[in-house]
Every structure is written in structure tokens, then in C-alpha cells.
Swiss-Prot record:
EC number(s) reported in the record: 3.1.11.6
Reactions this protein catalyses: Exonucleolytic cleavage in either 5'- to 3'- or 3'- to 5'-direction to yield nucleoside 5'-phosphates
GO MF term set: exodeoxyribonuclease VII activity; nucleic acid binding
Alphabetized CDD domains for the sequence: ExoVII_LU_OBF (cd04489)
NCBIfam families in the record: xseA
Keywords: Cytoplasm, Exonuclease, Hydrolase, Nuclease
Protein name: Exodeoxyribonuclease 7 large subunit
GO annotation, biological process: DNA catabolic process
Compartments where found: Cytoplasm
Assembly notes: Heterooligomer composed of large and small subunits.
Length: 460
């Protein structure tokens, strides 16, 4: 005979405890997409709110050590993606969620990424008015970078034909939506700059959702627009749509048709200039407001940590930038090597033996002419100096003195007679005249008492 099964009898507290354990063990952590409502942020720093959809709702708590990692400020009515654990509040028998992380869902996440990239590029100066290039007036050729199958191209061509049918237009096809679009837009801008056949570019597309327009919020596209040597007019979506490309471009047009109006010639040129100045003022105002928002954002989130996805995006962007810089450095080195090779060939040709021999022959001829001329001048100078020395020597010769009527008297021992004390009566003297000698004998010596008349020669 079968024994009756004794039923398990629970108390309320044990039941709630068992249910809590089952929920925590079986469910673990889950991801939940829902809308925030009844958000409460008391002074304790914890967050309490309700997550709901159109049919149900559940209470949720997010403690301070978890919500400090949230990179945005949640608000009622906002769609979010929450990672949470399920638990049961045993004393009341209510189950709730304990949130570990939170991020915007759908367009909210894209908007957060948009603001982060905008702040970073703005801090780098890519939005500065000083970098804006003036549009040509009038434009000689217009380039259009957009999809060939979109309505934007049709609108641009229609306006250009209506306003200035003779204006040349070059189309650079590119995808404007999807994963391939940013790369194609970058390559189209680079191609237009390489070919340099247009003096202004229109980059844009028709309207759409934030996700549809996301290619124009790509950092690669923004940097390509900033690096363009050709002025760029952005024309993305409708007037209410704002993209990163609008901030970086030299001028923002609210629609592709408006962009065609701006770049084409019109009878009323003043209107185009007025629109240009208005756009510059709008850009300056947007820049000022963006800086204010950035400052407010910094003050609001200075204790919050950066989201890992943003950090990963920056690393990926840096990797792409380094890759581009490496390619540019390699190209530069190749060009420098080619230039050095050409210069080396020219130097080698200049240093060839035939070239050196011709230079030496020419130099030798120059030296020969210089030597001959210098030798002639030297001989003439030496002849002149020789004549002068001969004249001086002749003037200083004793024979010349004798020829003027003077004489030289010597004693018999050859000593020249200068004073009367050198002789005595009876000494023999020799006097040298111009044409010979005279010998005489001293009979007496007398001192000079008076000056003798000029022309009288003395005698011993």
C-alpha cells in the first residue's frame, strides 16, 4: 500500500527566500530594453526608477557605485539598454531589478557618440572660423559628392541648370548611407583634390533619420573635409538636421538645393554674400554655444569615467591616423630619395673628367693672361724704379760733388782732412780734383777768423 506524500509546507518568509534564490540563480544577469519613468535621485546617490514598455513595468534600483559609471544623464521617457540582476525584496514579496550598467538605446546612443566626437573635434580646433575657406565668386566649376541614385543629386543639378546652365559640373559618386559610405566619401574628397578641376565642392545627401545620416558624423569624413584644399559646402538632410560635417565644412547649406543656390551665380550677388555671412555667424554662434555646452558637460561629468566604447573608438581613430601618417611618410621618403638620385646624377655629370678638364683649361688660360699682364706691369715698374735709383745714386756720388767745383784733401797717410789741427807745417797733402790730383806742402795753419766770400775754395 502506497504511503501518502506529505506536502511541503512553506512559511511566507521561506517562500519569498526560495523564490529570491531561484530568481538570482536561474536568471542571473539580463539585458533589458525599456523606457525610464518615475526616476528618483535622492541625496544618497542611488537611483530608483521604473522600467516599462507599453504592456508592463518593473521597479529598478541602481546604486551609487554603479551609476557613477553612466556617461549620460538619464531622464524620464528615455529609452535605455540596462544590464541588471533580478532579485526579490523578501519583506514585501516584490521583485525588482538591480541595474549594473546603463546606456542609451537607439538614437540616444548615436546622439551620445555625436556629442562626444563633436566635443573632441571642437577641442582640436576643427570648427574654428579661422580655418574656413572663402567660396569662389563666381565659381568656375562645381563638384558634387553624393549618391548618383539619390534625390539630392537631382535637386542640385536642377538648380544649377536653372540658375547657371553654362556652369560646369563634375560628379564624384559615393555611397551616402551604410558601412561603406564613410570610406567612399573620404576617397571622393581626396580624388577631387587630386584632380583639382573644381574650385568648390558640394558634399551631402537628402533627409533621413539620424542613423541614415550617420556617415556624415564619421570622424574620417570630418577630417577629410577639414584637410580639403577646395572649399566645401555641406548639404546634409533638411534644415533641422545637423551633422559633424556641417561644423567642419567651410559653409553649411540647409539642403542640397540651397547648396546649389549658394555656389551658383545669380543676378543678386548681394543675397549670396548675405547668406554666407549669416552662415558664418551661425557657425560662430554654434561654436560659442558648443563651448558653453562643453564647459557645462565637463563640470557635470568631471567625476564620471569615460565609457569603454568611446575609449575604443578613440584608439581606432588613432590607429587609422597613424596608418595614414605612415603611408604619407613612406611616400615622402620615396620622393626625397628620387630627388637625391637626380641631384646626384647632376653632380656626377658636373664632376666628370671632361667637364673638369674644360674648367682647368679655362682656368689655365685665365692664369696665363693674368701672369703675362702682371709680368709686364712688374717689368715696367722695376724699370721706372731703376731709373729713379740711378738718378739718386748719381746725385749722391762724390764725383758729382767734384764736378760742381769742390775738392777733397787727404794727408799722405790717406786720412781725410777735416780740421787744421790734423796737419803741421811741412806735412805733404794730396787734393783730389775733378780731373786729377794736386800735391802740396803745408807752410802754415791759421784759424778761420772771418767768413770767406762765396766761391772761394779753401786750401791747406
Amino acid at each position: 500500500m502506497t504511503q501518502p506524500v506529505t506536502p511541503t509546507i512553506f512559511t511566507v518568509s521561506r517562500l519569498n527566500q526560495t523564490v529570491r534564490q531561484l530568481l538570482e540563480l536561474e536568471m542571473g544577469q539580463i539585458w533589458l530594453s525599456a523606457e525610464i519613468s518615475n526616476l528618483s535621485q535622492p541625496a544618497s546617490g542611488h537611483w530608483y526608477f521604473t522600467l516599462k514598455d507599453d504592456k508592463a513595468q518593473v521597479r529598478c534600483a541602481m546604486f551609487r557605485n554603479s551609476n557613477r559609471r553612466v556617461t549620460f544623464r538619464p531622464q524620464n521617457g528615455q529609452q535605455v539598454l540596462v544590464r541588471a540582476s533580478i532579485t526579490l525584496y523578501e519583506s514585501r514579496g516584490d521583485y525588482q531589478l538591480i541595474a549594473e550598467s546603463m546606456q542609451p538605446a537607439g538614437d540616444g546612443l548615436l546622439q551620445q557618440q555625436f556629442e562626444a566626437l563633436k566635443q573632441r573635434l571642437q577641442a582640436e580646433g576643427l570648427f574654428d572660423v579661422g580655418h574656413k575657406q572663402p567660396l569662389p565668386s563666381p565659381a568656375r566649376c562645381v563638384g558634387v559628392i553624393t549618391s548618383t541614385s539619390g534625390a539630392a543629386l537631382h535637386d542640385v543639378l536642377h538648380v544649377l541648370r536653372r540658375r547657371d546652365p553654362a556652369l560646369p559640373v563634375v560628379i564624384y559618386p559615393s555611397a551616402v548611407q551604410g558601412g561603406e559610405a564613410p570610406g567612399q566619401l573620404v576617397r571622393a574628397i581626396a580624388l577631387a583634390n587630386l584632380r583639382a578641376e573644381c574650385d568648390v565642392l558640394i558634399v551631402g545627401r537628402g533627409g533621413g533619420s539620424l542613423e541614415d545620416l550617420w556617415s556624415f558624423n564619421d570622424e574620417r569624413v570630418a577630417r577629410a573635409i577639414f584637410a580639403s584644399h577646395i572649399p566645401i559646402v555641406s548639404a546634409v538632410g533638411h534644415e533641422t538636421d545637423v551633422s559633424i560635417a556641417d561644423f567642419v565644412a567651410d559653409l553649411r547649406a540647409p539642403t542640397p538645393s540651397a547648396a546649389a543656390e549658394v555656389v551658383s551665380r545669380n543676378r543678386d550677388e548681394l543675397l549670396r554674400r548675405l547668406l554666407s555671412q549669416r552662415q558664418r555667424l551661425d557657425m560662430a554662434l554654434d561654436y560659442t554655444l558648443a563651448r558653453r555646452r562643453q564647459r557645462l558637460q565637463q563640470l557635470r561629468h568631471r567625476l564620471e569615467q569615460q565609457h569603454p566604447q568611446l575609449r575604443l573608438a578613440r584608439q581606432q581613430a588613432r590607429l587609422l591616423s597613424l596608418h595614414r601618417r605612415l603611408e604619407e611618410a613612406i611616400d615622402t621618403q620615396l620622393r626625397l630619395a628620387e630627388r637625391r638620385w637626380r641631384l646626384g646624377g647632376e653632380r656626377l655629370q658636373q664632376r666628370s673628367p671632361a667637364h673638369a678638364l674644360r674648367q682647368q683649361q679655362y682656368h689655365l688660360q685665365q692664369l696665363s693672361h693674368r701672369l703675362e699682364s702682371q709680368l709686364q706691369r712688374s717689368v715696367a715698374a722695376r724699370r721706372e724704379r731703376f731709373g729713379a735709383l740711378c738718378s739718386r745714386l748719381e746725385g749722391m756720388s762724390p764725383l758729382a760733388t767734384l764736378a760742381r767745383g769742390f775738392s777733397v784733401t787727404q794727408r799722405d797717410d790717406g786720412q781725410l782732412l777735416r780740421h787744421r789741427e790734423q796737419v803741421a807745417p811741412g806735412d805733404t797733402l794730396r787734393t783730389r780734383l775733378e780731373d786729377g790730383w794736386v800735391e802740396s806742402q803745408v807752410t802754415a795753419t791759421r784759424p778761420l777768423t772771418a767768413r770767406r766770400p762765396r766761391g772761394t775754395k779753401g786750401s791747406a
